[in-house]
Structure formats: structure tokens, C-alpha cells
């Protein structure tokens, strides 16, 4: 389906120069006395490379439909992460470059959404928050509680975040996947 470039938003998939691309960001610009244009940050799904492209606001682009599949993270195999569809038991091997920062929040059997455009994996969507175990946290020093003092803690995935002083090793904490910050005890 062809639509105006100005109607395309973040998270949608388009076909650009024959390649399937995921829209990472869109900006509408109207410089001085020039025509308005739409600037998009796109990621080519075949190469994994991101680039910036400009379109006139009336230019037509081919919009692709995204299919969402609920899967579970299974294991890591070299530089790939393997996800499984719990209904069909199909597995999907995803390169580390595509997983990106999401790897800091993945643990075995973690539910995630895989987005497909024309049977090509487009993106990985994590839940808003995940529950992870603290594997290393230094003890808080007595008298440090005058204000909201935080200390570093290492989680089971290797992610290091700031947590309140009362969090101890072995506890479960709720972490925001968008900001990578401590939310609460689990």
C-alpha cells in the first residue's frame, strides 16, 4: 500500500530502493522558504545499517504491514540469540546487532514480541519492565541514608544499574527496559 511520506511514523516498515526498512524516527521539517520535507532514520533489515533519508511530504512510499509474534528467548549461540514460538516451536536465530541493547534484559524463557515485515524479522519488542535477580551488590554504609542514596548492582544478565541501599544480593528487582533503571522490588 502506497502512502504519503508524511503519514509514515516510527515503528512502521517501508520498502525503500527495493529493501525492507524499519522506520526508527521521523521528523517533519519546513525550512524558511523551501518546500516541506520528511526526514526519516531508517534501518535496512537485510544489512542492519541505519541511515537518514529525506522525502518530500507528498512523495509516496510503500508501507508494509508488520506481523507481531509472541516468542520466548531460549538461549545464546555464538553471536546469535535464539527465540522460540511457544505455539509452533519454530525457532528464530537473531544476530546480536539486531538484538542491540535488549540483550541486557533477556533471560531464559523471557517473553518478547518479534515483529516481521514480509516474513523478514524487523524488530524485537521487550515488555515495559522485566524482573531480574541481583547477583552482586555492595553493602550500604551505615549513615548513608540521609537522602535517596543509590548504589551500583549487577544483575543476572550482566547489566549494571543503580539501586537503593536496601537492595541485597539475591533479591529480585523490577527494571524498566526503556530507561534501564530500577523501578521497584519484585
From Swiss-Prot:
Domain of life of the native organism: Bacteria
Q: What does the record give under GO molecular function?
A: translation elongation factor activity
Pathway of action = Protein biosynthesis; polypeptide chain elongation
Q: Where in the cell is it found?
A: Cytoplasm
Q: Which InterPro entries match?
A: Elong-fact-P_C (IPR015365), NA-bd_OB-fold (IPR012340), Rib_uL2_dom2 (IPR014722), Transl_elong_fac_P/YeiP (IPR020599), Transl_elong_KOW-like (IPR013185), Transl_elong_P/YeiP_cen (IPR001059), Transl_elong_P/YeiP_CS (IPR013852), Transl_elongation_fac_P (IPR011768)
| Main localization, broad class | cytoplasm
S-S pairs: none
Listed under GO cellular component are: cytoplasm
Which biological process annotations from GO are given for this protein?
peptide biosynthetic process
Cite the Pfam families for this sequence. Answer: EFP, EFP_N, Elong-fact-P_C
CDD domains per the UniProt record, alphabetical: S1_EF-P_repeat_1 (cd04470), S1_EF-P_repeat_2 (cd05794)
Biological role stated in the UniProt entry: Involved in peptide bond synthesis. Stimulates efficient translation and peptide-bond synthesis on native or reconstituted 70S ribosomes in vitro. Probably functions indirectly by altering the affinity of the ribosome for aminoacyl-tRNA, thus increasing their reactivity as acceptors for peptidyl transferase.
The family note in this entry says: Belongs to the elongation factor P family.
Q: This protein is called what?
A: Elongation factor P
- Which organism was this protein described from? Methylacidiphilum infernorum (isolate V4)
Upper lineage = Bacteria, Pseudomonadati, Verrucomicrobiota, Methylacidiphilae, Methylacidiphilales
Amino acid at each position: 500500500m502506497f502512502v504519503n511520506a508524511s503519514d509514515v511514523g516510527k515503528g512502521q516498515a517501508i520498502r525503500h530502493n527495493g529493501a525492507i526498512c524499519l522506520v526508527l524516527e521521523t521528523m517533519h521539517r519546513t525550512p524558511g522558504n523551501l518546500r516541506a520535507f520528511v526526514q526519516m532514520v531508517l534501518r535496512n533489515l537485510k544489512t542492519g545499517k541505519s541511515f537518514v533519508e529525506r522525502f518530500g511530504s507528498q512523495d509516496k512510499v510503500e508501507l508494509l504491514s508488520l506481523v507481531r509474534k509472541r516468542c520466548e528467548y531460549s538461549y545464546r549461540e555464538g553471536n546469535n540469540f535464539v527465540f522460540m514460538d511457544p505455539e509452533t516451536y519454530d525457532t528464530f536465530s537473531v544476530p546480536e546487532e539486531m538484538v542491540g541493547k535488549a540483550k541486557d534484559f533477556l533471560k531464559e524463557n523471557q517473553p518478547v514480541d518479534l515483529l516481521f515485515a514480509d516474513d523478514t524479522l524487523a524488530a524485537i519488542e521487550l515488555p515495559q519492565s522485566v524482573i531480574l535477580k541481583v547477583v552482586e551488590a555492595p553493602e550500604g554504609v551505615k549513615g548513608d541514608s540521609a537522602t535517596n542514596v543509590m548504589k551500583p548492582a549487577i544483575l543476572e544478565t550482566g547489566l549494571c544499574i543503580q539501586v537503593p541501599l536496601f537492595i541485597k544480593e539475591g533479591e529480585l528487582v523490577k527494571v524498566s527496559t526503556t530507561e534501564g533503571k530500577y523501578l521497584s522490588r519484585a
